[in-house]
Curated annotation (Swiss-Prot):
Top-level taxon: Bacteria
Similarity annotation: Belongs to the glycosyl hydrolase 3 family. NagZ subfamily.
Keywords: Cell cycle, Cell division, Cell shape, Cell wall biogenesis/degradation, Cytoplasm, Glycosidase, Hydrolase, Peptidoglycan synthesis
Name this protein carries in UniProt: Beta-hexosaminidase
This protein's record includes keyword Transmembrane helix: no
Gene name of the record: nagZ
GO molecular function, one term: beta-N-acetylhexosaminidase activity
Amino acid sequence: MLIIDIKGTEISQQEIEILSHPLVAGLILFSRNFVDKAQLTALIKEIRQKVTKPLLITIDQEGGRVQRFREGFTRLPAMQAFGQLAKHPQEAIIWAKQAGWLMAAEMFALDIDLSFAPVLDLGHKCKAIGDRSFGEKVTQILPIAEGFIDGMREIGMATTGKHFPGHGQVIADSHLETPFDERAKANIFNYDIQPFEYFIAKNKLSAIMPAHVVYTQCDPHPASGSTYWLQQVLRQQLQFKGIIFSDDLGMQGANLMGNFLQRSEQAINAGCDLLLLCNQPEGVIEVLNGLTYQPNKLEQQKYLTLKKRRTIDFQQLASSPRYQQTKQHLEQLHECWLEWQTTH
């Protein structure tokens, strides 16, 4: 089951037909699909009307540098800002919960089902992660990340922990190349995997997205295409029962798995329920034409558990005192974070 993208600010008849394909479960939106709030609202409404099946509409609206919609929306600080700028730990938790709540509320008000969040990678040295991470120490990030998760869950948005089992300790950016993490297995299990294990045990993750990283001391395949990581560790050892998304199979980090069809087959066989394939329209056609895997009815319905279960009116949301106060505070925090970065 694929989650794919569209080219621009309007949707073509061909894109409607592709989104209606039985093997397509959802759509991911990018900045290129956005002009302003009115255009975006109209686009999503048209897609909902013309694609008659339930479609999972998704986005990366984490905050900081990974925020697809900006003009007309709250500028959210990067996740590192909460722990770095807070005067005491409880303040960081409150800020994170505010951000999770507001982000989810704004997306629901657009009729977007979920944002792929939170990032549970540890550390800031990785080019792909950086200040997207809540922090470096497990004990530091758990309460802050939990605040963000609880804010999302208060609205009713499904949570997606990424990038399992941890992308933070490699320098390379998996958008551009396949990173290799050569640390001992014990290091990964005693450090990187801890946030995932913690939130799985508390039943606070609806979904998990594995990394396009090869952990050489554990398995020769990227985690996104690894039976070891997804079946043995995630499903059996950690007892995760939610949805597994692949990370974008169009990324260079997935090149080790072959062409787009081979990548998709490997990810499915490894245990992914839903596959992201972005910025590769020819690749999407290749996969839809070549994939022999046919999900059963139960598997086809599984992703519906991630859809939003409430309707929020943007005007009503924007007029509420809680929203106004939270928006003002988070945008001030965002500016403080930008200033902090210039001096450190």
